[in-house]
Amino acid sequence: MEEGITLATLDSHDCPVGSRMTSFISSDGPPGIEISLTKADSLEHGLRGLESGDIDVLAIPAGMIHGNMLGVLQAGCKIVGARTPVRPYPVLVSENKLQYQPKSAILLCESKLGRRQLRRARRGIRVLSPEAYADIEGRADTPSDPISLTKWMEELRESGDIDGFVVARGLYDKCQLVTRRHSLLPDGLNEGDPHFIPPAYSDLIVFVARSRFPKSISDEISEKEGETAWWVQNNFVGSLDAKS
């Protein structure tokens, strides 16, 4: 058994990093190292912990790294691995599948990519962002917190004002919704089902460590599929940023 490490986790509303790492350590059998888990309050807090040596690795949703890589590098750190996404696909929260929505249906979706895919898959229905819907209906500003926004949309669905909405699976679970959900998958379960691409970095966890962190240790917690997902998505999104 190698010397143990301290791994800090940082959750987002749609990526439960802490529970994922706890499950990995407990159910997959102990890796070749002893891992002690702790929590970070923010990316900045985690980077300070790495700089001071209080922690050895920071596990964080990949989406939090986007736009913050310079800060990671300035802290003398780098991405040393990633975990394969478990549930990256968003869900449609509605009594009906997308194909069976009435022609007058109103669906809400925050993601611009998601709205485009919904309109392509089911022409004729109204697919709006929560902000656009609130503006059209003359309602108060939408909640800024993802959990509050999800609950707000569920209240609209329950009252019959809308027919459904799309959220990350992690948000659905965190809000403890019991309404029927329909996963928007890249390959439909049944013939004729529409195909959807999940948003970049969905449910993807990356590991941040100091620049000279031993590869033999990062290999114990990282997965090749996760590393590939990170490399592909980060390079793709980075190329879009460079063109904008």
Feature locations, PLM:
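Short coil/turn connectors at secondary-structure junctions
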Residues: 76, 101-105, 162
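Flexible hinge/capping segments at coil-to-helix
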Residues: 90-107, 121, 125
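Small-molecule pocket liners
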Residues: 76-77, 86-97, 195, 201-207
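Short beta-strand-centered segments that line the small-molecule binding cleft or hinge
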Residues: 46-89
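Small-molecule-sensing regulatory modules
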Residues: 1-52, 115-116, 120-244
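Residues that line or immediately flank small-molecule/substrate-binding pockets and catalytic motifs
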Residues: 62, 96, 169
